[in-house]
Every structure is written in C-alpha cells, then in structure tokens.
C-alpha cells in the first residue's frame, strides 16, 4: 500500500513536460503469463551449466531491455537539468518486430562460395521463392559454378534470376530482404554489399560456426513465408561507420562505375587537397595491426579529440557488440549483447600488464593514427576485408553508424543470443558438481 501511494505521489509531482519524456516502463516488472502470443520459448536443452532459458510457461516482459528510466531527482533539492532537444526516444529492443509498408517482391540470395553441400539447399530455396512469385537476385559468379551451370533441371529457374556483380552494380534500392545460406562470414559479406540502409536479413546456419545465423534449413518454407507475411522479431545489429583519410603520395585514385579503390562507394570518396578519404560500414570489427613487420605496432587512440592511450603491441580491435563474440573474444574481451549500445576497444597482445579491454558509449568518435614514434606502418582491415596499409599522416575515424543490420530472429534477441553462446561457443560448459549424500553430510556435521 505504501509503494502504491509513493508511485501516485511521484506521478503527481511530474510536470507535463517531464512526463512526456518519462518511460512508460519505469515502474514495470517482469511477470509470467500463460497466454501472451508473441514472447516466450519452450524449455529446451542447453549446453550451459546454467538453467535452461525459459520453461513451459511463457514470459511477458513489461520492462524495457534498456532498463527502467532513472529517477532524475536526487535528495530534496537536486535534479537533472532537463533539455528536451537532446532527448532521444528509443523503442524497447524486445518489442521490435518486422513489418512491411508494401508486400516484399524481391529477395537477394547469398550463398557461401566453394561449398558443394550448399548447392541443393540453394536450388530448393530459389525454386520455392520463384513459386511464391518473388524476384530473386543472385551474384553472377554463383551461376558460373559448374554444378549449377550444367544442371539442366535447374535451367528454367536459372533463367529467371536477376544477377549483379560486387563492386560494380548498385542494388541497394532493389532488394526487399536478404537470405543468407552459409555461416557468419556469409552474413558479413552481405553487410558489406550495403553501405547505406540494409534490408532485413534472414540467415540460415549452413556454414562452419553460425553464431549469427540462427535459422535451421529443415523448415525453411514455413519460416520464409512467415518473414514475407511480416511480424517477425528482429535485432538491430549496430555497425561502425569508418572513415579512412590518407595522404596522397603521387598516386591517383582509380574510379570504376562509381566505385573507388578497394571497392569503397564513390559517395565515400572525398578528394581534398593532398587527401583521399574512403568510407566503410563495418558489422564486426576494425582491426589495426602491425602487418608483416616484426616491430610492435605503435598507434595513438583519440576519443572525441582527446588522446586516451597509445597502443604498443600487435594491434588493437575496435568492435561492435556483434563483433565482441568474434576476434575480440579471442583477444580476451567480454561478450556484449547486440542490444547494448557500445563500442569495444580491445588490444591485441599489448606490451603492458595493465591494458584491459574497455567499453565506451556508442556515440563517441574514435580516431586512430600512427604514433610519431612508430618505427613502422600499420595495417587495417574491415570485417576481414579491404586490408590496406596505414602510414604516418593517415587517420582512421570510427563511430557508430546510423545504418544497423536488421537481423531476423528465430525467437527473440535475448533467447537467440544465449542459444548461440551455448550451441556455438559452448559457453560455461563443465561437468556438474554432484551433491552430497545424506550420510556424508551427517558425518561432516558431526
């Protein structure tokens, strides 16, 4: 009763302006429900030593994944100065569902290359999409596979494909959604094809690891139909916007069909006096390392214009929460759920006993340059691609992109993530400790 009176008093004290910026889930809690139609999952086997996620009951969340809105009054007189112009309203990630303004008509199918085991799933999927009257886009090099080119039974379907070439054809405004057949690398490749807005991605686990590919291909027809109809759960995987500025050293930049050197978009090329700028969208991580040199890399890291540290070691990884389970995890970083807005900085074999990985807010801007004392150059890669050399005077600016990758979930963002931790990375797997027998307990007490 006292708690209810306190809530009523707090609501009365809020001014109309303040109430407009108050989260509706401030005083919510998580409750159990037997009839909630969307959220929840059945009890399943988990490889983790922890209890399985969920049970036969269904779970209804009444609190945002971002947590409750903080009370902004402190003591009897202090409060946070309100500035409505700087307040950003963010939808609860747990409630994000895919919907269509118009029925989807075109789909891009990306298949892992040089994998014969994927030919049959690829043919079955494309045939099904054609039967659903979808326009199917594939890469031209996929159709050049001898196994597909020589298959006469697949010829009628193959003639209906729309093809494109990476780094030459812009299909960003022609694709309604993407289907990936392969592993995590296939999804990373799909992300690299879209340097702006990314269509929703449905990823089937047909590769090696599959941490980012939650769908099984066994029931692909019903799952694809559900996505086409809409109302599927999605997780917005943040990407990094990376701008590389290099000093021109007597080399002209080649531009082919709107694309610059290393496949960067022409819109990302900014030819200043003596400068060349390229821009990339990165899903996992930006890696700056020493390359083939035997010397330690020596790079300065700036945050919002301030020098925060100098990295001396094999290099440094700047990753998204999605990338925290990739190279960063191998380098000793913590794993971050993709709904946590953050950027992670992880050193690679630092020559220091106190250099721990750190997590910084998603809205900061990082800038990485060779230190003036550096004995050699450095090398940078973006999701393992577009590797290039960084010299003195060059800079790499990194911040969170406004174009996330919308990844379609099997269940929901939280359940899918912990399922991947258990099934792919075998997180916290150990033999369970046996309990004491009653006689042994009595002897110890005696």
Swiss-Prot record:
Temperature dependence: Optimum temperature is 55 degrees Celsius.
Catalytic activity: NAD(+) + ATP = ADP + NADP(+) + H(+)
Pfam name, any one: NAD_kinase_C
Tissue specificity annotation: Widely expressed but not detected in skeletal muscle.
GO molecular function annotation: ATP binding; metal ion binding; NAD+ kinase activity
Keyword list, A-Z: ATP-binding, Kinase, Metal-binding, NAD, NADP, Nucleotide-binding, Phosphoprotein, Transferase
SUPFAM superfamilies from the UniProt entry: NAD kinase/diacylglycerol kinase-like
Residues bearing PTM Phosphoserine: 46, 48, 50, 55, 64
GO biological process: ATP metabolic process; NAD metabolic process; NADP biosynthetic process; phosphorylation; positive regulation of insulin secretion involved in cellular response to glucose stimulus
Cofactor field: a divalent metal cation
Activity versus pH, per record: Optimum pH is 7.5.
One GO CC term on file: cytosol
UniProt EC number: 2.7.1.23
InterPro entries: ATP-NAD_kinase_N, ATP-NAD_kinase_PpnK-typ_C, NAD/diacylglycerol_kinase_sf, NADK
Enzyme class: transferase
Family: Belongs to the NAD kinase family.
The protein, known as: NAD kinase
Originating organism: Homo sapiens (Human)
